[in-house]
C-alpha cells in the first residue's frame, strides 16, 4: 500500500469497563518536497454529527474532497461507517476525477475502524489499530505495545504513539490533534 509523506494518522480502539474508547489523532506537519511549509495543519476531524472520526494522509485538497464525499455517503447511509466507506471506494475507483486523488483516509466510529484507499480498498485492521502516512508504521508499533502492556486510555495511547513517530519520522511533527468518541 502506498504511503504518503508528510503526516502520521493513528486510531486506537480500547475496550474498557465503561465501553469502547475510540481515539484518532494526527500530527500537523505539511511538507512540500523536503521543506516544511506548515506545522499546525488539522488533518483530523469529526464527521456525521460528531459520531465518526476521520483523518487523512496525502494531498490536502484531495483529502478535503474525500472528506466531503465521505460525509455525503455517511448521510445517505444513516451513519453506517462500513457501507459509506464501500460506497465511497466504488466512486473513487470509477469516477475519472476522483480516481486521480492522492490521499488515504483513516475513519472510525464505535463499531469499526477502517482504512480507505484509492486502490479500492476498505481495510479493517486487526486489534483496533489504524495507522497511515509516512510515520504510520512507527505509530502502529508503539500503539500495539502500549495497548498490550498498559491500561492507558485510547487517547493517551494515540498521543504517546504519535510522539514516538515524531521522534523517528522526519515527515511527522509534535503538534497533534486528537479526537475521541
UniProtKB/Swiss-Prot annotation:
Function: Protease subunit of a proteasome-like degradation complex believed to be a general protein degrading machinery.
Naturally occurring in which organism (per UniProt): Acidovorax ebreus (strain TPSY) (Diaphorobacter sp. (strain TPSY))
Quaternary context: A double ring-shaped homohexamer of HslV is capped on each side by a ring-shaped HslU homohexamer. The assembly of the HslU/HslV complex is dependent on binding of ATP.
Binding-site positions, Na(+): 166, 169, 172
Family matches, as HAMAP family: HslV
MF (Gene Ontology): metal ion binding; threonine-type endopeptidase activity
Keyword annotations from UniProtKB, A to Z: Allosteric enzyme, Cytoplasm, Hydrolase, Metal-binding, Protease, Sodium, Threonine protease
Compartment(s) where it occurs, according to its Swiss-Prot or TrEMBL record: Cytoplasm
Catalytic activity, reaction form: ATP-dependent cleavage of peptide bonds with broad specificity
Biological process, per Gene Ontology: proteolysis involved in protein catabolic process
Uppermost EC category: hydrolase
Protein name stated in the entry: ATP-dependent protease subunit HslV
Stated family: Belongs to the peptidase T1B family. HslV subfamily.
